[in-house]
Amino acid sequence: MNFKYIFAVSFLIASAYARSVQNDEQSLSQRDVLEEESLREIRGIGGKILSGLKTALKGAAKELASTYLHRKRTAEEHEEMKRLEAVMRDLDSLDYPEEASERETRGFNQDEIANLFTKKEKRILGPVLGLVSDTLDDVLGILG
C-alpha cells in the first residue's frame, strides 16, 4: 500500500510540474508575441516621426528658398541658396535612397564614397543647425 501511495503522489507531483512548465512556456511565448508587437508599434511610430521631420525640413527649406528667390541677393545669400538647394536634393535622395546611391556611387571607390557621405551630412546639418540656432536666438530674444 505504501508503494501505491508513493507512486500516486509522485505521479501527481510530476503531472503538476509538467503543467507548470507548459504554462510557463505558453506565458513566455505570449510575452514574446506582445514584445514583438510593441517593437513593431515603436518602429512604426519612429518611422512616422522621421517622416514628419523630413517633411517639415523640406517645407522649411522650400519656404526659405522662396523668400530668397524673389529679391536681389548678395553673394553670401547666393551661397546660402546653393546650400539650401543641395539640402533639398539630399532630402529628396532620402525618399529614394537606392536611386540616389546608384547615381552618386557610380565609378567611385570606397574612400570617395565615405567622403561623399560625410560632405552630404555636413551640407544637411550646417544649414539646419544654423536655422535652429537663429530660431532659438529669436525666441530667447522675445522671452528675454
Curated annotation (Swiss-Prot):
Residues 19-43, 74-123 form a propeptide. It is found in: Secreted. Keywords: Amidation, Amphibian defense peptide, Antibiotic, Antimicrobial, Cleavage on pair of basic residues, Cytolysis, Fungicide, Hemolysis, Secreted, Signal, Toxin. GO terms for cellular component: extracellular region. Residues 1-18 form the signal peptide. Pfam families: Bombinin. Maximin-3 shows antibacterial activity against both Gram-positive and Gram-negative bacteria. It also shows antimicrobial activity against the fungus C.albicans, but not against A.flavus nor P.uticale. It has little hemolytic activity. It possess a significant cytotoxicity against tumor cell lines. It possess a significant anti-HIV activity. It shows high spermicidal activity. Maximin-H5 shows antibacterial activity only against the Gram-positive bacteria S.aureus. The other bacterial and fungal strains tested were resistant to it. The presence of metal ions, like Zn(2+) and Mg(2+), did not increase its antimicrobial potency. Does not show hemolytic activity (in a concentration up to 80 uM). This is Maximins 3/H5. It comes from Bombina maxima.
